Amino acid sequence: MLNKRRSLVWGILMSRSTVITAVLDANVLYPAPLRDYLLHLASLGVYEPIWTAAIQDEWIRNLAKARPDIKRAALEATQRSMDRAFPGSNVTNYESIISSLSLPDPDDRHVLAAAIKSKAKVIVTANLKDFPSSALTPYAIRAEHPDEFVSGCIDRERKKAIKALENQVKALKKPPLSREKVLENLKSTGLIRSVAKLKS
């Protein structure tokens, strides 16, 4: 009985240790369909999401500028909802690391600093060229395109990935969207392989 209990505890610890921690760059939070699906995946424990106030401010600022029809207050409400839903995801006290880092675009160093501070293994970003492996490998961090990241999530946790899609469809009410339309929207954000896997 004791051995079974130890095995159960060890199994739980191992399952927790294999959950990937990933920093979500502003450019993957910018498109609502992709942001929603990433958060639905996280809500089912497929991975642990990480962001900072600076990352949140960046996507909100850029989206508000590109879409003046969307009120900034609504976007900020989304940010607050994210912080409430994932209370451990908003990383702080990483700023002191920034000056020691080197990236092609110095303005991206705060993202890497957040990854280092949170011990994340992945930076999910659409701009892979801004996060070369030569700059990330010393910290045991890698950059992944959202399609690569989500595709990997589907491979590891297919049932949860499908459930996340179902939850996303159910949550969309204004206006409601069909499963096919949600998949089409996800594909338009660059999730080519991922959508193919979700359809198969």
Can you say where each PLM-predicted feature lies in the sequence?
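PIN/NYN-family metal-dependent endoribonuclease catalytic core
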Residues: 21, 32-66
